[in-house]
A protein has these predicted regions:
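C-terminal transmembrane helical hairpin of 12-TM major facilitator-type secondary transporters
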Residues: 277-323
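Helix-to-loop junctions at the C-terminal end of transmembrane segments
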Residues: 65-77, 265-278, 361
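A membrane-interface helix-boundary motif in multi-pass transporters
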Residues: 47, 158-175, 359-382
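Extracytoplasmic gate region of multi-pass secondary transporters
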Residues: 34, 215-256
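Cytoplasmic helix-loop-helix junction between adjacent transmembrane helices
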Residues: 108-144
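Conserved MFS/SLC helix-loop-helix module at the cytosolic interface between two early adjacent transmembrane helices
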Residues: 64-99
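Helix-loop-helix hairpin linking two adjacent transmembrane segments in secondary transporters
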Residues: 100, 137-192
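A late C-terminal transmembrane helix in Major Facilitator Superfamily
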Residues: 333-366
């Protein structure tokens, strides 16, 4: 894909457009389900078991979309972004329909749309910002998912306080997606072609040698367990808080707090100076996220859930950011397939998390006990990732 057009806007407009595009596709299209889930449970339109499968349908869609983008790229990125945003609006509004059998299909398609918008927004915006001489500012767009989480989380909190129905919440979020898309639309302009017309292919720019298959496989496994590690918290946080902090007025603020952590983590990761071995940064991020996942269980208080939300959110973008750089380092001649492998295993972890939580809840003495077991397993998977990275660091030292 060649994301280079005439220069239609200044770099700040492009960064804001990218940020809002990701806020729409990720914060609303992918993650709006989390703050609305307690409302759906309260309305009696879904059970926790059904919610687990709805979440997995979305994550399966995201995996399918991400892999499709990796191996079957489209030639018109801005058109793909626009269509993905329109799809996000329609599919979000569709969740207000009182027809439960339709919902898994809507969430699956929303997952595909969010993946397309994420991949093509990233490619287009980063290229445009670089063409204008501000490449280092491009990573600012990755605050978008966190901004979307904060926006939907605060909105859902207000809806709960004022007695909204879940259907009303879906309609409101669809309208919010429409408003954000209207702001983004004029910036998404420019020429797009399938591939550069000349010069050295991008896969040949790197001159470093290929690393061993064992190293790549271990990196993929290490990244894959992170998908399972965070997803139970990212899917059920408001519900878990209601099980532990019964009657607290702050129950719906933990999710937007997690979004604040995502924003902070994206800003810090994008401004870091070059690190010789990024695997140490990944170890640190995994330990931080494992602590966040387990925090509410070992410190079941307002402070514990607040700290846990931040500790899960801060490494969220950073883990992906660092892992993708590692993929480029170990497979410089085959970057896309390597990223596809990492994405696939991470996606499988996400897909497995919610149904496993649903199974544990249905076979536990109480909902709280089921969630506790699921979160312990999630934290354990992140610690397993730390072990994988420790092996990588020891067996495959960075030499350049």
């Amino acid at each position: 894909m060649d994301f280079s057009p005439p220069l239609p806007a200044n770099h700040r407009r492009i960064i804001v457009a990218g940020l809002l595009s990701l806020a729409t596709a990720m914060g609303i299209g992918r993650f709006a389900f989390t703050p609305l889930l307690p409302m759906m449970l309260h309305d009696g339109v879904i059970t926790l078991g059904g919610a687990s499968w709805l979440a997995s349908a979305n994550y399966i869609g995201y995996l399918v979309g991400a892999l499709f983008c990796t191996f079957r790229p489209f030639s018109k990125p801005t058109l793909v972004i626009r269509m993905g945003l329109v799809s996000t609006i329609v599919l979000t509004l569709g969740m207000a329909a009182p027809y439960e059998p339709l919902w898994p299909y809507l969430r699956f398609l929303a997952g595909i749309s969010s993946a397309f918008v994420f991949v093509y927004t990233s490619g287009w915006c980063l290229t445009q910002v670089a063409l204008r001489g501000h490449a280092s500012m491009g990573a600012m767009i990755y605050t978008g998912p966190g901004a979307g989480i904060v926006l939907t989380g605060l909105a859902a909190s207000a809806m709960v306080a004022t007695g909204w129905s879940a259907a009303g919440g879906w309609l409101a979020f669809g309208a919010l997606a429409l408003g954000l898309t209207v702001l983004v639309w004029p910036v998404l302009t420019g020429r797009n072609t399938l591939a550069p017309t000349g010069g050295t292919p991008t896969t040949q720019v790197q001159t470093a040698g290929e690393h061993s298959t064992g190293e790549v496989a271990l990196l993929a496994l290490a990244y894959g367990v992170a998908g399972f590690g965070y997803i139970i918290t990212a899917t059920f946080l408001p519900v878990i808080a209601r099980q532990v902090l019964v009657g607290s007025p702050w129950l719906d603020l933990f999710w937007p707090l997690l979004g604040c952590g995502v924003i902070a983590g994206a800003l810090v990761a994008s401004r870091m100076k070059r690190v010789r071995d990024l695997r140490w940064m990944l170890v640190f991020c995994y330990l931080m996220q494992a602590a966040g996942v387990a925090m509410g269980q070992f410190l079941p208080s307002l402070l514990g859930f607040a700290l846990g939300s931040l500790l899960v959110g801060i490494p969220f973008t950073a883990i992906t950011y660092f892992a993708m750089q590692e993929a480029r380092r170990v497979r410089p001649q085959h970057v896309a397939p390597t990223i596809g492998l990492l994405t696939a295993l991470y996606g499988l972890g996400q897909i497995l998390g919610p149904p496993l939580a649903g199974y544990l809840i249905s076979h536990a003495a109480s909902t709280s006990e089921g969630f506790s077991t699921a979160l312990e397993m999630a934290a354990g998977s992140l610690l397993l990732g730390v072990v994988f990275f420790a092996i990588l660091i020891r067996r495959y030292p960075v030499t350049t």
